[in-house]
């Protein structure tokens, strides 16, 4: 068998015991690296490990002055030789290497010492990775550990180091890319080729996006802000948009709009929903009055800002009228007016930034502008259809049609030119005027020429696209954060992909509301939104019967209290004990316990083979049990035999009176009418028949049914 290279020895000492382990060198690339070890090789490594461990333990005891026990007189150098022999290494070569290259002078050990002095500790993994492969003897390992002790360097687990020093393992972009490439390679090596698992595909795609630094987040946030400012600047150039903004104040005053629908800083709707769902949780204090007063103050502040905006808008309108009037202005005055308009729009922009106008309002205004543009496009499409139909240019045709209304000769010329009858020319003229009228109506509503309106709308769309592109980059770069948070909420009623989807919705909300100027990292801000979106989705969708959010919180609190009491008293707590611990009324605790019950499917498989279902074991109380059915059949048979011993008249009277074999029982009057006798006679016949039935010869057949 060929000689094998020595394996590294990694030492994980504790205060009580030193346990060196043979650390394997990384296998070279190729098929040999992928092959499994033979049983003989594994056995040799285990033998070497035991020998080195025993030698190291003896050395420690010797240094502490502890006399070796019986069977412990093993020399460390002999142990090193045995370990080297176990892995088929020449001990003389090892000794020569040690003499020529002392452990303390090795570059790897020096680097370890430098890193340990800087941090104050080293992890076992760092020591194992850095130690050379030829350090296998207990003396060498002990020398290394002694050097760490002399330099006050503690050897700890990686997990303990992270907890004690609050160190979170960081992964660089390059490492993540390498991991992603390795995962993809592993997936490609699978027997079935690339995996079709949607979670795996999503994670692979997610891993291809680079992480962002704080500077990258700020740069993207600035691009989002610039795009939104472009939209607002384009809106200010449209008078119809300015009028929509001014109308917000009136809608606030008349309560047609709420504060949270107008500005970004208002409380979220989710908070108010919780308040609506749990009215009994609200105390009798002044909180509602304070909220109402706060909203009134906010409305007053917004109205003041809108009044300032109105003043600037009116001044801007006056200057624009002056600029567009037929009155001739000097070039100097024109420049002054244009500069004043620009300054006023800058001030209007500042007011909008102070207001922090909600994106819903901006989107609503943009939608209104889009509706105007669509009306213009529709009218222009009608004109183009007429051009194609009559093979003419509308730019030349419109003046001619206008002249033809006043001059019949021009109309005849047009008829000949277009090969139309007078009626067809009249229809063409009417269609053209209708389309032109639609365009002019839009211009009147927008108070702008169509060209300016379209130019402003294009600027709005450009700003929106830039902002959306930047938002998309910020979202894609933080998808890992969503996955890491969603992992903590698995097995709560929603699938993992659903949790990721809900978390992504929360992430997009966080992107919309992120303010980089406050100095916080985006992940810090987004974590709350992601967690809130996931928990709300679990509360809304995880249960078959939806439970309000405030009740979910109460249920979770009750479950935590119940677990605490189980640990404290050693058994399941009673509702009374839970109510006392939670300081809640007993009725409410019982109600919460009842609500917390989960529905279970009747198709739930039962048994090891799962060949039966839960529904098979549930009693159907709407059906008669087989035992009762047999008893009833026997009772009917015995009753029929007993009645057969009476006279036919007596039998029929009893049957009609007690409803035996009849649809219902009958009164004495009804039976008397059937027999054409009086009620008294029927009563006498009934009494006589019952006396006969009470005779032991007949009653013994029915007595067992009465007793049972």
From Swiss-Prot:
Region (Disordered): 1-43, 57-105, 160-199, 265-288
Name of a matching Pfam family: Sigma70_r4
NCBIfam families cross-referenced by the UniProt entry: PRK05658.1 (NF004208), RpoD_Cterm (TIGR02393), sigma70-ECF (TIGR02937)
The gene coding this protein: rpoD
Name assigned to this protein: RNA polymerase sigma factor RpoD
GO terms under cellular component: cytoplasm
Domain of life: Bacteria
Positions of short motif Interaction with polymerase core subunit RpoC: 498-501
Organism listed in the record: Myxococcus xanthus
